[in-house]
């Protein structure tokens, strides 16, 4: 009998504690597919690092750092390289929703914009990361 009361008490305590902690749901659907998305999702909630992303790109180059090779590599990884533009881009965002907290909407967009100019080489790689409140439904 006493053992049953202890088990019931522990169960109620765990349930009550679980209800009090904030939870985050994450939606990666608005990131373009590819190796860059995989890298961002593995790093989340941390920001992507330029050095690590550079190494991922270099691994695809096999020592050939010409503009065409860079363009081909980043395209295969999920970046968009439009004809007539000198840059390749990766733009997308992660939506997050925090529940079980007391202030604000709890919804945010983490926007990622990654740019490289294949003609200027790997040193031109730039990563912009911004967090804004998500006001969309």
Give the residues covered by each predicted segment.
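Immediate post-signal-peptide N-terminus of mature secreted/exported proteins
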Residues: 25-35
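Sec-dependent signal peptide recognition
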Residues: 2-8
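Bacterial signal peptide processing site
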Residues: 18-21
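Terminal, regulation- and interaction-focused segments at domain boundaries
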Residues: 37-77
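Short, low-complexity, Pro/Ser/Thr/Gly-rich segments in the mature regions of secreted, periplasmic
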Residues: 123-137
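C-terminal motif of bacterial Sec signal peptides marking the signal peptidase cleavage site
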Residues: 14-16
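Short, linear, compositionally biased motifs with a strong N-terminal bias
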Residues: 10-12
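A cross-family detector of function-defining hotspots
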Residues: 67, 72-117
């Amino acid at each position: 009998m006493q053992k049953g009361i202890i088990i019931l008490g522990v169960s109620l305590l765990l349930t009550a504690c679980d209800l009090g902690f904030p939870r985050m749901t994450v939606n990666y659907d608005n990131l373009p597919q590819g190796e860059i998305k995989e890298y961002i999702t593995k790093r989340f909630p941390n920001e992507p690092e330029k050095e690590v992303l550079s190494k991922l790109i270099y691994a695809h180059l096999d020592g050939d750092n010409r503009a065409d090779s860079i363009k081909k590599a980043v395209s295969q990884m999920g970046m968009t390289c439009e004809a007539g533009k000198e840059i390749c881009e990766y733009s997308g965002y992660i939506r997050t929703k925090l529940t079980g907290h007391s202030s604000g909407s709890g919804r945010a967009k983490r926007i990622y914009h990654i740019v490289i100019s294949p003609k200027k080489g790997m040193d031109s790689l730039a990563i912009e990361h911004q967090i804004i409140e998500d006001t969309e439904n």
